[in-house]
């Protein structure tokens, strides 16, 4: 696995107002396994976390940048043959806004306005605007649902290959794989752990209702965790998730093990008054915590 070593320095310089070329984060399937995948996700979180703040000891993503050039991160994904695609990631929410293959770039419908600026994202490429968004509703509308699409090394290889070859008939399915294995894994440590556990050989797994429930409720969890800071950590509104066995799982406060050990990133929500703590430039992981969440809540 290849991860750009200079990205942290670049991000720090950008934070202090130096305008330099954006850095890339790389992940290659050649030699990839659970450990290299964890390193990749940790690096992505580290870049997203620089210059941010924390609530309930969880990183809250940025909601403004000092320069438009800092709005997107580039992530290079390589398949087993070494073919490369580049994802454009919005640092505000970890959404994939588009991708680049060769000299051709594609941007999702309803992406942030800055994503359509060719000088900011994939400069010099031949641009095509897709007719659908990167949301699951649109991606699943003409293809299989998340519960029917396997995740793993081989599905990721197929997804990268389809995008590299510009096979538009497979774009939606390919992005369902990529978004979960990149964006959702960055947001949720518990999803990262589930994926990493299954990254060996030809092994795959299909997301169950517990994982899909987490993905669908990231915004709600982000909002309640931040609003709870004025209420002693108690959520103003309960968040109801679903366990793997189909039982409702109610999250009431920010001390819940799932919140403290399962969530890595929060989307910034403005409807609150919160006291922040400044984050450092490192991201600590705990495999033991992952197992604790799985055991306590039966999510996996």
From Swiss-Prot:
PROSITE patterns (UniProt xref): SHIGA_RICIN (PS00275)
Annotated source species: Gynostemma pentaphyllum
Pfam families per UniProt: RIP (PF00161)
Record field: catalytic activity: Endohydrolysis of the N-glycosidic bond at one specific adenosine on the 28S rRNA
Segment forming the signal sequence: 1-23
InterPro entries: Ribosome-inact_prot_sf, Ribosome_inactivat_1/2, Ribosome_inactivat_prot, Ribosome_inactivat_prot_CS, Ribosome_inactivat_prot_sub1, Ribosome_inactivat_prot_sub2
Lineage: Eukaryota, Viridiplantae, Streptophyta, Embryophyta, Tracheophyta
Catalytic residues (positions): 184
EC number per UniProt: 3.2.2.22
GO BP terms, alphabetized: defense response; negative regulation of translation
GO MF: rRNA N-glycosylase activity; toxin activity
Glycan attachment points: 26, 57, 117, 129, 253, 284
Role: Ribosome-inactivating protein of type 1, inhibits protein synthesis in animal cells.
Family statement: Belongs to the ribosome-inactivating protein family. Type 1 RIP subfamily.
Protein name in UniProt: Ribosome-inactivating protein gynostemmin
UniProtKB keywords: Glycoprotein, Hydrolase, Plant defense, Protein synthesis inhibitor, Signal, Toxin
């Amino acid at each position: 696995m290849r991860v750009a070593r200079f990205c942290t320095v670049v991000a720090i310089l950008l934070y202090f107002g130096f305008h330099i070329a954006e850095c890339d984060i790389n992940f290659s399937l050649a030699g990839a396994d659970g450990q290299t995948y964890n390193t990749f996700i940790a690096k992505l979180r580290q870049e997203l976390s620089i210059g941010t703040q924390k609530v309930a000891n969880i990183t809250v993503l940025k909601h403004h940048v000092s320069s438009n050039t800092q709005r997107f991160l580039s992530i290079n994904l390589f398949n087993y043959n070494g073919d490369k695609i580049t994802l454009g990631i919005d640092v505000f929410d970890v959404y994939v806004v588009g991708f680049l293959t060769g000299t051709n770039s594609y941007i999702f419908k309803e992406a942030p306005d800055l994503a359509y600026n060719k000088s900011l994202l994939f400069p010099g490429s031949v641009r095509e605007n897709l007719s659908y968004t990167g949301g699951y509703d649109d991606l699943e509308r003409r293809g299989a649902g998340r519960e029917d699409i396997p995740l793993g090394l081989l599905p990721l290889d197929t997804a990268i290959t389809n995008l590299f070859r510009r096979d538009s008939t497979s774009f939606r399915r390919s992005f369902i794989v990529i978004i979960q294995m990149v964006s959702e894994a960055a947001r949720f440590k518990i999803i990262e752990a589930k994926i990493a556990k299954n990254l060996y050989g030809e092994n795959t797994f299909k997301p169950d209702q517990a994982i899909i429930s987490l993905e669908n409720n990231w915004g709600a969890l982000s909002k309640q965790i931040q609003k709870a800071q004025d209420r002693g950590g108690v959520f103003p509104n309960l968040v109801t998730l679903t366990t793997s066995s189909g039982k409702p799982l109610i999250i009431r406060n920010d001390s819940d093990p799932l919140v403290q050990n399962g969530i890595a990133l929060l989307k910034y929500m403005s409807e609150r008054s919160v006291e922040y703590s400044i984050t450092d430039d490192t991201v600590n992981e705990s495999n033991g915590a992952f197992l604790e969440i799985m055991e306590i809540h039966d999510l996996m």
